[in-house]
């Protein structure tokens, strides 16, 4: 039903976590809950309609629909995704800040909501050609490489991510700004623009993902209380309040 593929290009591997392909069959139904994540998803759909409502996405078969591109924003509330019918989805999962390397527009300007259609002429034209052959992943890789660009402003933000992601070393936001060579106000503005959330919100998402990873990878499963304190949350109610 879903096939996941790692990028073959060393350049793309730095900025893209994976690609995945979903093939829905006629009369099929599939749903899952997406929890807050530091990665960013961008999906190409064929023969599908996308409906957004109350932190949920319904993707339904629509043979009259052309190619549609959907981009997720940063969200701190779990999302329900529901798929119905025969449709095709090809997705790019970008690593933190990775999406910005392939667009001249910043992430926040493109994705201010939890999910929205991508309106970009170059990407729209590529989307129309994407489903015309079976060589879709190679097509996407070639296209992404053609769109890749460097940005010094973004480099400063990328340098801050490791410091924010380290749940064992609680460096203050002003200290992180100083370490990447920016004053606090400029750092917060650039971070919001390229990451779609504040540094504080990003750190919360990272701690939440760390808690999930800790739970899944531990040989001795920890209870919620242990996870709460291991990841720096004061109590269970605080953890639940943040993300549920």
Walk through the language-model features, giving the residues of each.
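Alpha-helical bundle regulatory/interaction domains
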Residues: 1-174, 179-184, 197-198, 213-217, ...
